[in-house]
Amino acid sequence: REYRDELENDSISVNYLELSSRNKAESYVDSLIKFLKKKKLSEINIFEIEDKSFEEEFLKALKDANVTVNIFKSPMFIFERGEFVSMAKGKKVYRMSSFYQKARKNLDILMDENGKPVGGKWSFDEDNRKKIPKNVEPPKMIVFKKSKYDEEIKKLIINNFDDHPGNLENIWFPVNRAGAEKQLDNFLKVRFENFGIYEDAMLEEKNFLFHSCISPFLNIGLLTPDKVIKKTLQYAEKNNVPMNSVEGFVRQIIGWREFIRGIYHEEGALQSKSNYWKHSKKLTSSWYDGTTGIDPLDDLSLIHI
């Protein structure tokens, strides 16, 4: 709803169907097709759909309804799907490090004039495993003003999704683009310098350390990776941010995030049906109720209950 308001404030006409106004027996795709028929539309433009099962359902339903679908590259990722295939071509196994190096070269990110990685090596990961000293206090998170739709949406969630995991008591994140950009800016100014050195650190009862906490915004499109990388590199150059922090952060976005997306689309169907480790037992209830005896795992389980 915040996004709808943003678009309308930019003088863009928006047709918005609220969940509360939809027939519960009607799927999202059903509602879309009904809308298209009402408006007498036979062609639509969409970005790539990342969820493979939903993509299949969506495209089949639109085809059956005789609606032409024009698909455009997703702005939520840097590379096209086909680029992952070409970058992995000739490899017997998928390796993130190989993909990451090609990505750096193709995008000319953190490369010197001789085509070599800035700093003399591709990864500074070995520098990013320090414990947080007792005298170092992680910065406090920004407290964002609640959306004007906050209470309304919470009631909607309780009424429709009460059996889903999680709770509504710890919503720390902003829900609009301005808030997402503010979160990124705060990370760059307050956390970025120490991101690298403490990247793998953990502190008991601390959910947020020196990480950016922008994954939710990248995953729903409030931030796009190309703009995040551009702003990050500009800030790093201007403020002499340590290379292990710069490279480590860049690697998460153009390396791991793009790599796992590529694996999902190329091998996801096979992986979902395979059992590489030959597991035969179910997880016990302790994994879900936070009683395994493994503190980090139990803490995480309790947070999500």
Positions of PLM-derived features:
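Histidine-anchored nucleotide/phosphate-binding helix
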Residues: 1-6, 26-33, 232
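Acidic-and-aromatic substrate-binding clefts and catalytic sites of carbohydrate-active enzymes
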Residues: 20-26
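Beta-rich, aromatic/charged-enriched effector core domains that present basic-aromatic interfaces
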Residues: 27-173
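N-terminal beta-strand-loop-alpha-helix module at the start
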Residues: 1-19
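Conserved small/polar residues in nucleotide/adenosyl-binding loops
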Residues: 303-305
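Glycine/tryptophan-enriched, flexible segments
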Residues: 106-250, 260
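Aromatic-anchored, charged helix-turn/loop surface patch used as a conserved interaction hotspot
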Residues: 251-298
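Short His-Asn-centered micro-motif
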Residues: 17-19, 46-49, 72, 220, ...
